[in-house]
Amino acid sequence: MKELFKRGGIMLFDKNILQKIDEELKTYVDKDDKLYNASKHLLFAGGKRIRPYLTVVTYMLKKDDIEEVLPAAAAVELIHNYTLIHDDIMDNDDERRGKPTVHVVYGEPMAILAGDLLYAKAFEAVSRIKDNKKAHEVLKILSKACVEVCEGQAMDMEFENYYPTMEEYLDMIRKKTGALLEASVGIGAVMADCNEEEREALKEYAKRIGLTFQIQDDVLDLIGDQKKLGKPVGSDIREGKKTIIVIHALKTLDEDKKKRLLEILGNKNVKDEEIKEAIEILKPSIEYAKELMKQKTEEAKEYLKIFNKDRRKVLEDLADFIMSRIY
């Protein structure tokens, strides 16, 4: 019998599946030394496991032998954690998931190596896929996603020097955040022997949840719960991040509010009251972001209609969770 529990107010995560994913992940990092402990620091620090879970439940649209898909699911999560370790170094972040980041605890050189180790272990995981044809397809999807994540991160860093257009920003998040979510679903589809029509529908579903995932991150930074987020609310304002909310605001605000917002954005010495003031200025754009997420979530669920109603429900619920999650 499935044991489900709530996340973000939605009853959808199967504890048995999450446990199997964790057990699979442990087999890749089971040594006890500084390098492996650094690689495990974030991997078992309470992440949501959305990406490997997506791989498994996509696979379960058509198949039931979870053991077959676990190495593929683990590969996705190992890549995800590698990107997080390196992101934290590039962004100079001290905290993630309410804990000190890997480079803070182990130093930058060891953190870089820990990320590299997880990257290599992901391809070890792919090599455990028993069907060679599927392993080859998974390898193609995963390597393409890794390239796009790097391209997206580079774009994000370049945005520090100018204000991107909405189109540029959406392209960046499709790569930086969306690529690995798309890969998670695409890999599940390969492992499930989905046909071309099914794969295309799942690709469109994944594109939309990838977009809503990043937009919700941007929203939560402004109106989320600091304890649940594991980082200070408003940190994107302090850092001057060009989010979809900021880009929309700069297009739609009157000149006085725009001028005031630009004075606060990226000011490292900004006071808490000024952060609150900026959030107040951004409220209409936060609402715009929420409406866009609703639209994309409904579109995502529409693409699932070609699958069995009962089997697709968890993917529909995951789309809702990604939009409504609180951390």
UniProtKB/Swiss-Prot annotation:
Its cofactor is Mg(2+). Its EC number is 2.5.1.-. SUPFAM superfamilies: Terpenoid synthases. GO terms for molecular function: metal ion binding; prenyltransferase activity. Pfam families: polyprenyl_synt. Mg(2+) 1 binds at residues 87, 91. InterPro entries: Isoprenoid_synthase_dom_sf, Polyprenyl_synt, Polyprenyl_synt_CS. Its main location: cytoplasm. It is an enzyme of class 2 (transferase). One of its GO terms (cellular component) is cytoplasm. An all-trans-polyprenyl diphosphate binds at residues 96, 176-177, 214, 231, 241. One of its GO terms (biological process) is isoprenoid biosynthetic process. Binds 2 Mg(2+) ions per subunit. Keywords: Cytoplasm, Magnesium, Metal-binding, Transferase. The keyword Metal-binding applies. It is found in: Cytoplasm. The keyword Cell inner membrane does not apply. Isopentenyl diphosphate binds at residues 48, 51, 80, 97. It comes from the Archaea. Mg(2+) 2 binds at residues 87, 91. Belongs to the FPP/GGPP synthase family. PANTHER family: GERANYLGERANYL PYROPHOSPHATE SYNTHASE, SHORT CHAIN ISOPRENYL DIPHOSPHATE SYNTHASE. Homodimer. This is Short chain isoprenyl diphosphate synthase.
